[in-house]
Structures are given as C-alpha cells and as structure tokens.
C-alpha cells in the first residue's frame, strides 16, 4: 500500500497539474500555432540532449533559460533520454540525429513547417521538452520561446503544449541610420540583446556620426575604434541579432572616374571588418543620385563575389 507521504506527493502533483491546465503563455512575436493539452508537469533534475549541429551560442541560451528556475548548474548533458529526469531534447530537422528521429517517432509534425524561415517545433509533454529547428538558429528561437514561458511560470510547473512557429520574413531587426542624437555602443549592444529575446536577426550599423561609415568609408578603422566594433560583433553573435556593418559610399564623394579603385577600397575595408569578426555587410545606395547604374551594379557584383570567396559571409547585402 502507498505510504501517506506518497499519497500526499501524488495529491500535490495532481493539484499542480489542475492549476496549470488553465494557463496560457504570452509569447512575442505571437507563434503561428500554439495548442495546449491537459495537464503539465514539474521540471525536476534536467537531462539535456543536443545534436551535433547545435552551436555553443544556442547551448548558452539553454543554460540561461534553465537558470531562471535554478536548474542550470545541476543539468546534465548526455546522448539520450534518461529515466526519472526532465529530458530536454534539442536537434535539427533532417539531420537524422537522435532528436530528429525522436520527434518523427513520437510527434506529428508536418514537414511543410520547415519550408519557412527560422522554423521550429517546440513541445512540452509529460516530463520532456523537445525543440526541433530548421537549423541551429531556429533551435535558438525555440529556446527563446521557452525563455518567455519560463519567465511566466509559477514555480517550476509547466503546461503541456505544442508550438509550431516560423518567421514570415528572413531579415528581422533594426537599422541605425538617422541623423539625430547618436546611440552609444552600450545602447547598440543593449538593443541587440533585446532583439535576441524577440528573434530578431540583424542590427544594421549605419550611424551618421561614424565617419568611417560615411565620409571616410575608404579608410580603415584605427585599432581603438576597431576594438569597439569587435565588442559589438560579439554581442550580436551571442544574441543572434547579428551586427551588420554597412558603408555609405555614394554620400561620401564617390569618384566615378576611378570607380574600380573605389570598389577596391571598399573591399579592403570589408576585409578589415571581416578580420574583426563581421560576417554580414551592406552598401547603402539611397544617395546614389545620377551615378550610372552600371557602376552600382558592378560594385554589388564585386561585393557579392568577395562574399562568395570568403565562404562564411551572409550574402544578403543591404542596398
């Protein structure tokens, strides 16, 4: 026969489950699909399974989320589910890895979900949480949704649910390109961290108080200024609201008679910033004026070729 303590524990679990059944979580941007199931469970000692394609930044996000409920330090990382623990599985769709196979075997997820930008499946179900993303960034977005939920949970009890979500546009973020009071670097980094909490992808750096973006776009940054760029790049990488460096060459006296040399100067500048860790670049063309379009086309062709040779530059240029 069960002991009095066992009965009390079961009654407490039942009360928690009943209480959480009416909970609905507020997540922004609003997920495309969120369905709730009856009941929930208490998050106990955590076991995490990561597939190989999940990057360190995404793992760090998981640690951050677990720390909200004091679960990060005791969490273990293994290669498979562990009985008696709260298992959190994070993997990539189509990888044929442990999590990819597990989700296909235990959940119903239409493959068309993964035709969309940043798509992921997130489920909380009877002692386990699973995140299956289109890529490691999408897994990060799923864990970020979990962060929203953890911040709203009363205690460590989470409701059973399934979420299917994706982005309607590929580039999501903000640009600093106005002529008013400039932001400080602390402002910029704070905004990237904020953007990372809302699944933004990009902070487009185009401040008009930075002469090396505008009037001195040909000139390399001094080391002191480059160090500041490196710091912002790191925050962008860590938040996945990535730092996008742009040049404004057509406002800065572009010499069309020496267009080839001007383009080479721009690529040298890009090389310097690439070495500083920047992997997203843009060219602002809003002041192109009467410049022959063939020059602009040639510039962007050369920029695209440069990015392709680098191999790891995001080739979505901003024009």
Model-inferred region functions:
Residues 318:
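Conserved small/polar residues in nucleotide/adenosyl-binding loops
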Residues 59-62, 225-229, 262-267, 294-303:
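Well-ordered, non-membrane alpha-helical segments in soluble/globular domains
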Residues 10-126, 154-164:
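Acidic, contiguous N-terminal accessory segments
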Residues 1-8:
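C-terminal segment of classical bacterial N-terminal signal peptides
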Residues 108-109, 113-285, 308:
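Feature activates predominantly on carbohydrate-active enzymes
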């Amino acid at each position: 026969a069960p002991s009095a303590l066992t009965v009390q524990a079961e009654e407490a679990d039942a009360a928690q489950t009943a209480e959480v059944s009416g909970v609905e979580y507020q997540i922004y941007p609003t997920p495309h699909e969120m369905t709730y199931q009856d009941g929930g469970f208490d998050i106990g000692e955590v076991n995490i399974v990561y597939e190989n394609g999940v990057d360190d930044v995404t793992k760090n996000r998981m640690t951050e989320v677990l720390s909200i409920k004091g679960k990060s330090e005791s969490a273990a990382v293994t290669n498979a589910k562990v009985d008696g623990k709260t298992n959190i599985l994070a993997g990539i769709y189509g990888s044929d890895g442990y999590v990819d196979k597990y989700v296909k075997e235990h959940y119903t997820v239409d493959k068309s979900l993964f035709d969309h930008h940043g798509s992921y499946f997130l489920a909380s179900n009877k002692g386990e949480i699973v995140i299956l993303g289109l890529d490691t960034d999408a897994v990060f977005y799923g864990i970020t949704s979990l962060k929203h939920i953890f911040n709203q949970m009363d205690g460590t009890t989470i409701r059973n649910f399934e979420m299917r979500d994706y982005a309607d546009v590929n580039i999501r973020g903000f640009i600093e390109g106005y002529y008013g009071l400039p932001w400080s670097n602390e402002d910029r980094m704070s905004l990237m961290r904020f953007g990372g909490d809302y699944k933004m992808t990009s902070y487009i750096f185009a401040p008009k108080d930075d002469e090396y973006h505008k009037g001195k776009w040909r000139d390399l940054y001094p080391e002191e200024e480059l160090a500041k760029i490196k710091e912002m790049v790191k925050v962008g990488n860590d938040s996945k609201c990535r730092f996008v460096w742009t040049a404004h060459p057509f406002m800065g006296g572009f010499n069309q008679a020496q267009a080839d040399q001007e383009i080479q100067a721009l690529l040298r500048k890009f090389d310097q910033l690439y070495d500083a860790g920047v992997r997203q670049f843009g060219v602002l063309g809003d002041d192109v004026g009467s410049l022959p379009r063939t020059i602009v086309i040639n510039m962007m062709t050369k920029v695209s070729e440069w990015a392709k040779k680098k191999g790891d530059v995001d080739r979505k240029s901003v024009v």
